[in-house]
Regions:
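Conserved serine/cysteine hydrolase catalytic core
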Residues: 201-260, 270
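Conserved HGGG/HGGXW glycine-rich cap/lid loop of the alpha/beta-hydrolase fold
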Residues: 37-85
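Active-site loop/oxyanion-hole signature of alpha/beta-hydrolase fold enzymes
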Residues: 24, 29, 37, 70, ...
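The conserved beta1-alpha1 loop
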Residues: 49-53, 121, 243
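Catalytic histidine neighborhood in serine/cysteine hydrolases
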Residues: 262-276
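Helix-rich cap/lid subdomain of alpha/beta-hydrolase
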Residues: 151-208
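Conserved hydrolase catalytic core segment
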Residues: 114-153
Length: 296
């Protein structure tokens, strides 16, 4: 698989993000490297696994990571292949639901994560929520933000986003973040642009909107329905939900539907100033989640 790696200097001096990434290659990644953060004690009694979506990367969790680390936990934040500091396939068609899901399953096994709190937003949840049923002994909690089960049903808001994305093969990532979170500084916007020097690096950005299952037989839909059913019948872990209320695609209606699929999920934290990328308000979300779980 032909791929590009974003030059390391584009990630120099990232604001509020001092962590150096590790790189991992597994059988499921087809020779490509996943860049990831692995911080905190390796032998901690619990771990936070933070999964981002499109078109972001681990930088989106910069306000949540310090809160999780301060609790004494191990904290792991991978960049999906095609994003952040991970390798980037050149061809749009190299991306598939099963490819990314399989890479995450192998990654979790390789790092031997236990007592995991799964922290997800956007595609982090579309992939991530299908993982616990495959390895239930590893997962204890979920922290849900502006995401969904990818069961094959999509909203008109999503269809509008997909049409917008498909009309922009060289998507201006920084402009998208500025529109969603107007308080971002110029250097923060530049950090979201950093992984993508030009259109050659943006195959994942072009592919992902078209990977969202939009029919019952779409790739990923069946496993997502199975995951939804598993949560409904077998999940006994704790949960916390935060909603970026300004999200036009995965806002409160979508999140309330998700909440109904997670037994015991409490009333959500509503972040009225937050949009789709609600982790930009993540410090208070992480603190509230930990408080609801007794500070751990």
């Amino acid at each position: 698989m032909d791929a590009l790696t974003t030059p390391a200097e584009r990630f120099d001096a990232l604001p509020a993000f001092p962590w150096t990434a590790r790189r991992w290659v597994g059988a499921a990644t087809r020779g490509l490297a996943i860049a990831y953060l692995d911080k905190g004690p390796a032998d901690a009694d619990r771990a936070f696994l933070c999964l981002h979506g499109n078109p972001s990367w681990g930088y989106l969790y910069r306000k949540m990571l310090p809160v999780f680390l301060a609790s004494g936990a191990r904290v792991v934040a991978p960049d999906l292949i095609g994003f952040g500091r991970s390798d980037k396939p050149v061809l749009d068609v190299d991306h598939s639901f099963d490819f990314h899901r399989g890479a995450l399953l192998e990654f979790i096994d390789a790092l031997d994560l236990h007592h995991v709190t799964l922290v997800v937003q956007d595609w982090g949840g579309l992939f991530g929520l299908t993982l616990p049923m495959e390895m239930p002994e590893r997962f204890d909690r979920v922290l849900l933000m502006n995401t969904a089960f990818a069961t094959g049903e999509v909203t008109e808001g999503f269809r509008a986003w997909r049409a917008f994305s498909n009309s922009r093969p060289d998507l201006d990532v920084g402009a998208l973040f500025r529109r969603s979170e107007p308080t971002l500084s110029a250097v923060e916007v530049a950090a979201y642009d950093a992984p993508f020097p030009d259109a050659r690096y943006k195959a994942a950005l072009r592919a992902f909107p078209n990977l969202v299952p939009d029919g019952a037989d779409s790739p990923g839909a069946a496993v997502s329905r199975a995951a939804q059913a598993w949560f409904g019948s077998a999940w006994r872990g704790q949960s916390f939900m935060a909603i970026g209320m300004k999200d036009p695609v995965m806002g409160e209606p979508a999140m309330q539907a998700l909440r109904r699929s997670i037994p015991g999920c409490p009333e959500p934290m509503r972040v009225h100033a937050g949009g789709h990328f609600v982790q930009e308000h993540g410090g208070s979300i992480a603190e509230a989640a930990l408080a609801s779980w007794g500070g751990r």
